[in-house]
């Protein structure tokens, strides 16, 4: 009985010590959900581009076929300029009906284009890490609608040595060619909206090839820079200049930035 009592006293002491020991609370580990490896089906993005002969902006919709191949369509609005366009300062100072604006000497029309393209993306190198860069080859082609808008100037008519002069806003024609191309008769550029309702359509086609670099931080984001070659062609020569050769085909290098998301 004495041995049993001693054993019970020892067990009671162990239990008492065990009750005073508080088990360590496991530390919480917070980790941002990782989307790496998630299968995406489509992309939506918008962007802007600068060409060696103009600028534009666009919307892109892409369907992901598999990991290395995609197909897309995009619609774009851009402005194309002639390589001989040079901004000229008016020879007149303040004192007329408006402050003179600089103008492009010899320019007779502006060209704006709405294009629809479809194409394919070939992924050349996938991102190996979250901070990596994906490189792709994009090729596309489509149709264009060129809008040729008259470039209007404010011209001076009459004897400039007297007050017997008249200011007229006019577009280029065979009747006013001598005045339109006389810098001493050009007072100012008339403004961007002048000639808007006199635009004429010019059908055409477009094609593009470029390398795209996507370095977005997360897989569901798109942050892409693309560089490449763009070619726009029209049914007829586009009359942009009166003092230089006009063209039917407009090749140009371009760089674009595109932002969007995948889902």
What is each model feature region?
Residues 40-44, 51-55, 69-71, 110-114, ...:
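Residues that define the transmembrane beta-barrel architecture of outer-membrane proteins
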Residues 48, 57-63, 116-122, 141-145, ...:
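Residues on the lipid-exposed face of transmembrane beta-strands in outer-membrane beta-barrel proteins
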């Amino acid at each position: 009985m004495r041995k049993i009592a001693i054993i019970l006293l020892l067990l009671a002491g162990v239990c008492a010590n065990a009750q005073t020991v508080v088990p360590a609370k496991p530390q919480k580990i917070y980790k941002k959900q990782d989307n790496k490896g998630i299968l995406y089906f489509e992309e939506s993005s918008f962007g802007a581009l600068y060409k060696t002969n103009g600028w534009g902006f666009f919307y892109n919709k892409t369907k992901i076929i598999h990991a290395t191949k995609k197909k897309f369509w995009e619609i774009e609005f851009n402005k194309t300029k002639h390589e001989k366009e040079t901004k000229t300062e008016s020879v007149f100072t303040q004192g007329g009906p408006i402050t003179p604006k600089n103008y492009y000497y010899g320019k007779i029309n502006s060209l704006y284009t709405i294009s629809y393209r479809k194409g394919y993306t070939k992924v050349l190198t996938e991102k190996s890490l979250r901070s990596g860069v994906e490189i792709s080859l994009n090729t596309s082609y489509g149709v264009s609608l060129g809008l040729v808008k008259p470039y209007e100037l404010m011209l001076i008519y009459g004897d400039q040595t007297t007050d017997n002069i008249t200011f007229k806003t006019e577009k280029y024609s065979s009747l006013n060619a001598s005045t339109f191309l006389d810098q001493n008769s050009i007072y100012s550029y008339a403004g961007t909206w002048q000639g808007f309702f006199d635009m004429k359509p010019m059908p055409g086609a477009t094609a593009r090839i470029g390398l795209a670099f996507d370095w977005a931080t997360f897989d569901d984001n798109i942050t892409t820079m693309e560089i490449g070659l763009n070619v726009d062609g029209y049914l007829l020569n586009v009359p942009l200049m009166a003092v230089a050769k006009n063209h039917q085909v407009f090749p140009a290098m371009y760089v674009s930035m595109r932002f969007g998301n995948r889902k």
